[in-house]
Amino acid sequence: MKIQSTPPAGLNPAIATPAPPAAQAPKATLSTDPVGQSLTSALKSASGIVIKDQLPDIGRIKLLTPLPQGAARTVAQQVGQRQLTLREFDNGVAQLELSRPPLTSLVLSGGGAKGAAYPGAIKALEDNGALDGIRSMSGSSAGGITAALLASGMGAGEFKTLSDGMDLISLLDSTHKKHKLFQRICTEIGNLAHKYLPKVGSFTQLILNVLPRVQSEALPLEKVIRDESSKAVLNQISAHPQVVSQPAVAAIAHKLEQGGAVTFGDLKLLSQHIPQIKELNITGTAMYEGRPQMVVFNASLTPDMSIARAAHISGSFPVVFKPVDEQAQPFQAEGEHTAFKDGGVMLNVPVPEMVDRAFSTSPLRQSDNLILKFEGEEGVAPDRGARFGGALTDWMVGAPVAARVILQNEALAAHDDQTVTVPLKTDKGDFSTTFGGTLNFSMPGDIKNHLQERLDQAVSGHLETRAHSREQYTFGSMEAALNALDDDMLTSLAAQNSAQAGEVLQFRQQAREVFSELTVAIVAQNGTPAALTFNDQMRTAFTQLDALASNPERKEWLAKELNHADNVDHQQLLSAVRGQAVESPVLKAAIEEMQVRTVAVVAENIRKEVIFPSLYRAGQPDSNVALLRRAEHSLARATTAAQVNQALDDIIDHYGARNKPWSKPLSSTTIEMAKAWRIAE
């Protein structure tokens, strides 16, 4: 069963910021996807989360790993693709060193016209041979527009030519002739002001460019993205003639040649055959009855949606762009219309792990992101309610922007070694501000080149550093270290005559054979009208798994594998037997693991949906700040439903009035939300 992050009410499966039942009517049935899956599948559901420094699974943290002591015995030296080195010390502690995992994901932040720097990053990736290794691209706002073009197979040179030559102002023009004429006249006056009034001309030009285009429908922008992405995909198909023999690829090519649009499903299929084409994730902000919720468009949620349409939605900068009305998407009810705003409102830096809480069988990272965020966005987080400017922004946008930015920046700290800050404060000026960067749609070509060169240098430096970086992990035993390795790493160790690695490989092979038998038993029952029950065939499988769990490390590995995201059948079984008396140690451990994951996701979303929006409302007194921080601390360590409810009850019982002479609020969104988020024990 998919772990949901909401109270047990209906839920829109597209959203990543779920609403409790008191705040929003049901929009769809609960998803049955498993927990902790890849970004592409997880973004279809509502378990997207933004968390502080990737809060640890406290319930699964054991005593601190002892420090290595005594002499070290080298078990393996620089083996395998990641040049793994494994040592064992006299006190039994094992130490693992290996190179960084492959770079497979590019994350592009929103920033309006600041995105003019992005061609520098793509050039650096291409020059360093890293672009083809990128398998997915994720973008918000202007980053979503960039991601759509790049995921279509556009190379660094093509992208720079398009980006540098794109007249962003004209792409915001109205389709009505008289209105468009007025907009062009204002632009020409602005150009003259810039030329003849050096002190105030730039600002005047900006105002005359933007104000006449406020609430633009930006249809020309969507058309450019549609046309250019189609051209890029067709160019890649032509460059790989061998793939045209695939009927599905030929069908896509025919559709595009007839004027059709590139869809998310097209990119997913083509990415399996053409490395230059990537899977794509683009954020949008859905305004459900005034309540903002993040939606991530991708091949899992919206396979038939035009990527140009999604990029238009994501780039709909508040006030400047008119909200985009969307209907007939898989996550919408029949006849439902939803207004969308800029994807950066809810998450401007859409890092996969900040959207989908990853649960793994190993602490070792299997892949890396390259995260591009713009200089000047860090700031220092206040400890409470937004200042006037932040409160005004929240009101204008209709979303808790201040709280979301702080959540985002705290979560990004956990990905610092995967992040490159786009340089915007240079000797040629400060392009990190709203007027100097975000809305500077008439940025001169020499400035664009300058910013691109700076970013090229920054990304190249990052790639050079990560190529020589080594990660180090310490484990309490050699068994724990070996169980943290993937099969390829274990095979490399076994080839170096590591008998223990061979034993772990054999254990996994035997376990997977039993897993297959268990799956057959579950599928067989699913073919009958009766509810899933724990039968003799399943009981036999778990008896075999119990025998394989010859030590705590192997039992833990089995429990986590049974909770693996890709196996819906095992998830279904664990949900069916939860709450029943269980004899199998492995099954009991797997159920406990599922419960810990459920609680972790729910607790994190309470922090995101209840605590932070309340914490950053204007006028919070010290008592409320202390209360909310205490609840946050408790939720970070919660492993049971009772502990989650205890933290919520603390808020319900002690939350005070803001800016009022009386102590208790007459009505409170925070208290009502806390009540709605209580979960069954």
How would you name each of these model-derived features?
Residues 62, 82-83, 90, 99-107, ...:
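Patatin-like phospholipase
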Residues 1-37, 41, 679-681:
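Non-Sec secretion/translocation targeting segments of pathogen effectors
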Residues 347, 374-376, 397-681:
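C-terminal helical/tail subdomains of lipid-metabolizing enzymes
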Residues 29-107, 284-290, 634-646:
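Small-residue-rich anion-binding loops in enzyme active sites
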Residues 48-70, 89-98, 156-198, 381, ...:
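Extended charged low-complexity segments that act as oligomerization/scaffolding linkers
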Residues 231-251:
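Short secondary-structure capping/junction motifs at helix and strand boundaries
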Residues 208, 246-360, 436:
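Active-site gating loop/helix substructures
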Residues 350-377:
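A short alpha/beta connector and helix-capping loop motif
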